[in-house]
């Protein structure tokens, strides 16, 4: 029995993978050129202090909410390395970037008209979708 199995294994041809090239078809093999991804330099945020109330670490009675004294650990130990906004708190409006007079919309009447048309288009599109999927459309 063992000799039969061994002879049947030795009679089978060895499997070889041949490269067949067809004219007009692109090659699917990878080229030998190396691909290297290089990250850009560290982009620091230019602020005087971290945003948010915790940037100054001004704690009442010198302890945090759990009653422990701060050790200077946490995300704020990386302020000098990564920039001030390390905790991910990023306000939409910064007082340094506010307009001196907030009375006039910078976009003007054209900007307001574009905004209104866009809003009406979104609402009309939603109403059309509701109508088309309701029993009223049939």
Curated annotation (Swiss-Prot):
Q: Where is the transit peptide?
A: 1-39
Q: Which UniProt keywords apply?
A: Chloroplast, Membrane, Photosynthesis, Photosystem II, Plastid, Thylakoid, Transit peptide
List where in the cell it is found.
Answer: Plastid, Chloroplast thylakoid membrane
One Pfam family from the record: PsbR
Its cellular-component GO annotations read: chloroplast thylakoid membrane; photosystem II oxygen evolving complex
Primary location class: plastid
BP GO terms, sorted: photosynthesis
Q: Which InterPro entries match?
A: PSII_PsbR
**Similarity comment text for this entry:** Belongs to the psbR family.
PANTHER family reported in the protein's UniProt record: PHOTOSYSTEM II 10 KDA POLYPEPTIDE, CHLOROPLASTIC (PTHR34369:SF2)
- Briefly, what is this protein's role? Associated with the oxygen-evolving complex of photosystem II.
> What is this protein's name?
Photosystem II 10 kDa polypeptide, chloroplastic
